[in-house]
């Protein structure tokens, strides 16, 4: 079966070409590392692109302080094993406000801790190109985004002010203060990602595999009880409804804003089989994508990845 998956090798070659092109063309690139499955694949491709040498750029994690604990443990493990140059940035303004998704809501929390945090980090270190693991099949606004996504000096995305991309030729020319967000996985699908992870045996966060976990239903979303902080924001009725269920995650982010899905897929072949049958987008589990109509495009216009 796997030896016939030639399209994966074509996608791999395209992504490696893009990564090498950016490393050669830009003065100070960085790779965003969100610790999820797409980041894992992108990082694997980057290591392949420059093997046996080390990555010629650092990896950046914009931390919100509300990621799953397993994600933090996995991040430290990967950094140690791969010898990565990791930069972690937390928005100090958000820390001062004790920003959290319960008191301030998902939109405000995401804007302050993710969007503003990312812009702060890019400005602080002067990065002129930033790799991201977004794919066109994820969401409508991402479907119309270029591989080289031009951002102005305020990090804003204007869908009408983008460069044509003919064949595999990309225009990375920017003025001082402007930058490019680069998406090497643009043409991959969620199924491609899982098949490639299986083919290459890429390590991923265990949360992607089904297991019995403590969850509570909040506004129709199964939220995992990842640490004690969440208990401070639950009503007595919600606390009483906490129960264990076989679930896994198709996408990972801040745990109060990431919905689990009921599943028994505990191995990579199980997940691939599940992906072949599913009819819903993985981002349906992201609360931030449902803030308002067109919310993702508006976030991207303001500087979100």
From Swiss-Prot:
Sorted alphabetically, which InterPro entries does this protein's record hold?
PAPS_reduct_dom, Rossmann-like_a/b/a_fold, SO4_adenylTrfase_ssu, Sulfate_adenylyltrnsfr_sub2
A single GO molecular-function term is: sulfate adenylyltransferase (ATP) activity
One GO process term, biological-process aspect: hydrogen sulfide biosynthetic process
The UniProt record lists the keyword Ribonucleoprotein: no
Known catalytic reactions: sulfate + ATP + H(+) = adenosine 5'-phosphosulfate + diphosphate
Among CDD domains, the record links this protein to: Sulfate_adenylyltransferase_2
Q: Does the keyword NADP apply?
A: no
Q: Which pathway does this polypeptide act in?
A: Sulfur metabolism; hydrogen sulfide biosynthesis; sulfite from sulfate: step 1/3
Q: Pfam families, per this entry?
A: PAPS_reduct
List its EC numbers: 2.7.7.4
Say which family it is in. Belongs to the PAPS reductase family. CysD subfamily.
The record describes the protein's role as: With CysN forms the ATP sulfurylase (ATPS) that catalyzes the adenylation of sulfate producing adenosine 5'-phosphosulfate (APS) and diphosphate, the first enzymatic step in sulfur assimilation pathway. APS synthesis involves the formation of a high-energy phosphoric-sulfuric acid anhydride bond driven by GTP hydrolysis by CysN coupled to ATP hydrolysis by CysD.
Subunit details: Heterodimer composed of CysD, the smaller subunit, and CysN.
Q: What is this protein called?
A: Sulfate adenylyltransferase subunit 2
Species this protein is from: Ectopseudomonas mendocina (strain ymp) (Pseudomonas mendocina)
């Amino acid at each position: 079966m796997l030896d016939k998956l030639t399209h994966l090798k074509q996608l791999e070659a395209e992504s490696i070409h893009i990564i090498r092109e950016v490393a050669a063309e830009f003065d100070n690139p960085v790779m965003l590392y969100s610790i999820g499955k797409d980041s894992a694949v992108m990082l694997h491709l980057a290591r392949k692109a420059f093997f046996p040498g080390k990555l010629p750029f650092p990896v950046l994690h914009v931390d919100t302080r509300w990621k799953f604990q397993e994600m933090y443990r996995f991040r430290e493990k990967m950094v140690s094993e791969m010898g990565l140059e990791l930069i972690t940035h937390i928005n100090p303004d958000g820390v001062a406000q004790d920003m959290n998704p319960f008191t301030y809501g998902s939109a405000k929390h995401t804007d302050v801790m993710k969007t503003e945090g990312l812009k702060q980090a890019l400005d602080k270190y002067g990065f002129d190109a930033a790799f991201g693991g977004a794919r066109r099949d994820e969401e409508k606004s991402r479907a119309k985004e270029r591989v080289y996504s031009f951002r102005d000096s305020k990090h804003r995305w204007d869908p009408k002010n983008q460069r044509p991309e003919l064949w595999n030729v990309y225009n990375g020319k920017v003025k001082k203060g402007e930058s490019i967000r680069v998406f090497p996985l643009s043409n991959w699908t969620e199924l491609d990602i899982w098949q490639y992870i299986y083919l290459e045996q890429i390590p991923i966060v265990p949360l992607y595999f089904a297991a019995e976990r403590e969850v509570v239903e909040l506004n129709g979303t199964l939220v995992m009880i990842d640490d004690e902080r969440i208990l401070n924001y639950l009503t007595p009725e919600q606390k009483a409804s906490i129960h264990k269920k076989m679930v896994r995650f198709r996408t990972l982010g801040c745990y109060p804003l990431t919905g689990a899905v009921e599943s028994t897929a505990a191995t990579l072949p199980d997940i691939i089989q599940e992906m072949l049958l599913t009819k819903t987008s993985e981002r349906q589990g992201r609360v931030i994508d449902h803030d308002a109509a067109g919310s993702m495009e508006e976030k991207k216009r303001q500087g979100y990845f």
